[in-house]
């Protein structure tokens, strides 16, 4: 079980996301993270442990600033609790948060490795992020439709 949130608006996105995750923290204590679109670049802050660890990290490193973002609190299902397995996962084009289980992630991961993709985490979520990149056409809706046709399981995704 995980908690996922998204925000688009006029306020400082990082604060809104972290405050929203605080209300969902009971859904996951293993790690927390956010991704914020800052001046056209996706900035990710994430870490192992409770949401307070993320707050402290952003206080030390400087928080991302923007008006669009996604956030996640994690209860680990695939991969141990670690900074690397924390969400969000993604790349320069797409970043995601995920709640649930992708049942066929191993098969998708094997296919993507054969296509030249590499993985850093042990999560099923990273597999979906790479699949979004693989199918990316420039049209987000078309890309998401293709990915949803491939993945099996019970899940919710926040995609940015």
Regions found by a protein language model. Name each.
Residues 1-160:
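Conserved short alpha-helical segments that host acidic/polar catalytic motifs at enzyme active sites
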């Amino acid at each position: 079980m995980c908690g996922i949130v998204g925000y688009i608006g006029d306020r400082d996105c990082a604060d809104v996301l972290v405050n929203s995750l605080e209300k969902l923290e009971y859904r996951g204590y293993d790690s927390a993270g956010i991704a914020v679109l800052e001046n056209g670049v996706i900035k990710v802050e994430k870490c192992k442990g409770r949401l307070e660890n993320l707050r402290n990290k952003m206080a030390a490193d400087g928080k991302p600033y923007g008006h669009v973002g996604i956030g996640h609190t994690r209860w680990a299902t695939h991969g141990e609790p670690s900074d690397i397995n924390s969400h969000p996962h993604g790349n320069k084009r797409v970043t995601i948060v995920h709640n649930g289980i992708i049942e066929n992630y191993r098969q998708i991961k094997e296919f993507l490795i054969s296509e030249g993709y590499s993985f850093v985490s042990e999560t099923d979520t990273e597999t979906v992020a790479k699949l979004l990149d693989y199918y990316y056409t420039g049209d987000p809706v078309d890309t998401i439709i293709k990915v949803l046709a491939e993945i099996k399981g019970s899940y919710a995704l926040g995609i940015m």
